[in-house]
Swiss-Prot record:
Superkingdom of the organism of origin: Bacteria
Site positions for Important for guanine/8-oxoguanine distinction: 207
Designated name of the protein: 8-oxoguanine DNA glycosylase/AP lyase
Signal peptide: none
A Pfam family the protein falls into: Ogg-HhH
Chain's role: Catalyzes the excision of an oxidatively damaged form of guanine (7,8-dihydro-8-oxoguanine = 8-oxoG) from DNA. Also cleaves the DNA backbone at apurinic/apyrimidinic sites (AP sites).
GO molecular function: class I DNA-(apurinic or apyrimidinic site) endonuclease activity; hydrolase activity, hydrolyzing N-glycosyl compounds
Species of origin: Thermotoga sp. (strain RQ2)
Family note: Belongs to the type-2 OGG1 family.
Keyword list, A-Z: DNA damage, DNA repair, Glycosidase, Hydrolase, Lyase, Multifunctional enzyme
Catalytic-site annotation from UniProt: 129, 147
Catalytic activity: 2'-deoxyribonucleotide-(2'-deoxyribose 5'-phosphate)-2'-deoxyribonucleotide-DNA = a 3'-end 2'-deoxyribonucleotide-(2,3-dehydro-2,3-deoxyribose 5'-phosphate)-DNA + a 5'-end 5'-phospho-2'-deoxyribonucleoside-DNA + H(+)
EC number from the UniProt entry: 3.2.2.-, 4.2.99.18
Gene Ontology process terms (BP): base-excision repair
Encoding gene per record: ogg
Amino acid sequence: MEELLKELERIREEAKPLVEQRFEEFKRLGEEGTEEDLFCELSFCVLTANWSAEGGIRAQKEIGKGFVHLPLEELAEKLREVGHRYPQKRAEFIVENRKLLGKLKNLVKGDPFQSREFLVRNAKGIGWKEASHFLRNTGVEDLAILDKHVLKLMKRHGLIQEIPKGWSKKRYLYVEEILRKVAEAFGESPGKFDLYLWYLVKGKVDK
């Protein structure tokens, strides 16, 4: 842990304004965003699974509110055009998730751990990581996003022995707790800490 904290301290000063600015955007979305805005963010999180944040951002810009109203085949075609690896399947997930419209604002404002579990159980294409990602991107600070970049970093620094191939609730919470302790030692919430880790790995602060 100590070596990772040293690496993070070296980038803290340059990363902090970017992290704070990005998190303000997240909080604004959670507080002021409409159900449609929140649904578009949920759809972004569906798309980034087994793809990339950059691809998801590109798709979000191209499709916009089309996530809410485009017919299935049109949405699949749009995802094909932006280069998604699984356009048909992801379009099916997004269309099926429209049943959650009207519930998202309450989820964002509710208990983050209960909201995450609800999304894992009820949203298509959303697992523990994706549900954490959505809630963090709407201003929730308490959850860790255990994506492959973060897990590789954790393994490299001896925080975990191996990268899990899949997530059960128990396993996700166990690894999340390890990362939470590192975040606390760094003096940040898990949600913000993730952005510092991204800056360390990528040299930028995505979402």
